[in-house]
């Protein structure tokens, strides 16, 4: 990895339906093997199901779900004189978003509904109501950080 300068961030274009950059990032994370149209169908289908079930704006449900899943603090390993400590650190905003998206998709893939569209819509609805595996993952990470609060002075 080059230490000269950080790689430039690529510009992410907003999605065609909602005009939202976060939805595009979400689609890109759902995508397998470069099949963007399949990912688009899955995400828009899930948001359509949410609109049908809740009669609410699907974008606001999505944003609420992502907010409920994004971690504010996590633990990172730090080696100090032969011992490795789990040191709690704050999460940067870009990483918060990336982790939230990743956890939502992983939780959706682990569900038992028949299609990915149904799994994703169910997980997003659960997450927007502070339930589901993605929210549980965030709670576990926060608990781990709280348990290791004694080592917070090793922060870097």
From Swiss-Prot:
Xref: PROSITE patterns: RIBOSOMAL_S7
Keyword Chaperone in record: no
Gene Ontology biological process terms in this record: translation
Keyword tags: Ribonucleoprotein, Ribosomal protein, RNA-binding, rRNA-binding, tRNA-binding
GO molecular function: rRNA binding; structural constituent of ribosome; tRNA binding
GO cellular component terms listed in the entry, alphabetical order: small ribosomal subunit
PANTHER family for this protein: RIBOSOMAL PROTEIN S7
Reported function: One of the primary rRNA binding proteins, it binds directly to 16S rRNA where it nucleates assembly of the head domain of the 30S subunit. Is located at the subunit interface close to the decoding center, probably blocks exit of the E-site tRNA.
Subunit structure: Part of the 30S ribosomal subunit. Contacts proteins S9 and S11.
Family: Belongs to the universal ribosomal protein uS7 family.
NCBIfam families in the cross-refs: rpsG_bact
Name the record gives this protein: Small ribosomal subunit protein uS7
């Amino acid at each position: 990895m080059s230490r000269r300068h950080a790689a430039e961030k690529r510009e992410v274009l907003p999605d065609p339906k909602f005009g939202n950059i976060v939805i595009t990032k979400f689609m890109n994370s759902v995508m397998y093997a470069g099949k963007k149209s399949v990912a688009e169908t899955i995400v828009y289908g899930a948001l359509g199901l949410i609109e049908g079930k809740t009669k609410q704006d699907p974008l606001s449900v999505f944003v609420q779900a992502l907010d409920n899943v994004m971690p504010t603090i996590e633990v990172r390993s730090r080696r100090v004189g032969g011992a490795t400590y789990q040191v709690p650190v704050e999460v940067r905003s870009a990483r918060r978003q990336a982790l939230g998206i990743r956890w939502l998709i992983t939780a959706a893939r682990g569900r038992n509904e028949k299609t990915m569209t149904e799994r994703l819509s169910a997980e997003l609805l659960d997450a927007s109501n502070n339930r589901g595996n993605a929210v549980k993952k965030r709670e576990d990470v926060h608990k781990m950080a709280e348990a290791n609060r004694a080592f917070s002075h090793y922060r870097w």
